[in-house]
């Protein structure tokens, strides 16, 4: 049992170096990905654990959201190759063991990150509450799921949060193996460790929806989907000042959380002082700390308007898209029902 931010990464100097470390499985990944969908957590644990003693040492808080009957609606796996991120900021969220491996490589952190050759995932089968939509994902479409056609940055995380809202009792099964992810474009320019900062983006919507209202308890998924859509519709109808105020609060919370993580990384530097990449990593952390503190101290009074200006958009366009998204979510069950009638010819 664990959370998405507990995934580990191993970085390689090149795609060739990575391939030399590959262990090719002799089973069909599609069949393996689908085998647990629709099963209960109890059934999955019986199939994957040698006995109750296998749970020894697990943090009980990780199991609190689940019960023996918790269904598996989604399964996913690790990534082998490009991590799929727009920059190298993802390494900031890795556990200390991964950071240590990164800094211990004589190539240097940025050169290693620029190779875009990594394994990212769990070391074995892992149960968690949230999904991130991996390169190969299993979906149990026999039950109502939120729309799952992510095209933009952050929409995979938005799907995971919406799935949790619809089925708070469900569990996500993470396989311990990975599938290749080799983009067609050259992404070697994405190795730079730029200071961590937070601005208004799609993730603000995901963060807002993550906080489920207390009156959702015991409500069926169909009604929960409508409640989700109504939340988004209400956001699209807010006055500009009210919307800016909400986003300001979300940004402050997110920046404070990232600053705390940055300070934890800085505190851990004493254990990394003899590694080749420690100085570079320390500079990155100090710049990130200063950037986050600066954003917290000089809070932008109009984060939404500024984000829209950078994106060459405006508030009315955002409102219209929000309303259209809400209406599309409400229509999603009908779309799924119509899809059942499709036939391949």
Q: Locations of the language-model features?
A:
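Active-site rim elements
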Residues: 147-150
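Terminal low-complexity segments of carbohydrate-biosynthetic enzymes
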Residues: 56-59, 63-135, 142-144, 166-345
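C-terminal structured domains
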Residues: 161-164
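Conserved donor-nucleotide/metal-binding helix-loop-beta segment in metal-dependent transferases, i.e.
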Residues: 2-81
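Acidic donor-binding loop at a coil-to-helix junction in glycosyltransferase catalytic cores
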Residues: 153-158
């Amino acid at each position: 049992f664990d959370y998405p931010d507990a995934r580990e990464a191993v970085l390689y100097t090149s795609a060739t170096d990575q391939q030399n470390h590959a262990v090719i499985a002799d089973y069909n990944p599609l069949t393996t990905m689908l085998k647990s969908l629709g099963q209960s957590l109890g059934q999955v644990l019986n199939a994957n654990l040698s006995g109750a003693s296998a749970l020894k040492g697990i943090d009980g808080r990780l199991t609190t959201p689940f019960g023996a009957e918790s269904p598996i609606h989604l399964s996913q796996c690790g990534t082998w190759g490009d991590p799929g991120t727009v920059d190298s900021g993802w390494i900031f969220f890795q556990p200390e063991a991964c950071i240590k491996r990164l800094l211990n490589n004589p190539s240097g952190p940025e050169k290693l990150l620029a190779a875009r050759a990594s394994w990212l995932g769990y070391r074995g089968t892992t149960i968690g509450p949230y999904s991130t939509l991996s390169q190969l994902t299993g979906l149990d479409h026999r039950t109502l799921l939120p729309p799952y056609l992510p095209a933009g940055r952050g929409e995979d995380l938005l799907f995971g949060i919406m799935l949790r809202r619809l089925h708070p009792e469900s569990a996500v099964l993470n396989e311990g193996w990975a599938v290749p992810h080799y983009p067609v474009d050259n992404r070697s320019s994405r190795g730079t460790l730029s200071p961590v900062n937070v601005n208004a983006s799609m993730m603000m919507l995901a963060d807002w929806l993550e906080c489920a209202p207390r009156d959702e308890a015991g409500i069926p998924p169909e009604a929960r989907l409508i409640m989700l859509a109504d939340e988004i519709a209400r956001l699209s109808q807010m006055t500009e000042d009210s919307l800016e105020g909400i986003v300001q609060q979300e940004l402050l919370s997110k920046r404070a959380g990232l600053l705390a993580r940055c300070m934890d990384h800085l505190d851990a530097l004493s254990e990394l002082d003899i590694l080749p990449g420690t100085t570079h990593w320390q500079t990155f952390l100090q710049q990130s700390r200063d950037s986050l503190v600066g954003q917290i101290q000089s809070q932008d009074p109009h984060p939404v308007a500024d984000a829209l200006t950078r994106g060459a958009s405006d508030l009315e366009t955002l409102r219209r898209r929000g309303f259209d998204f809400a209406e599309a979510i409400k229509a999603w069950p009908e779309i799924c029902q119509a899809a059942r009638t499709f036939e391949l010819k």
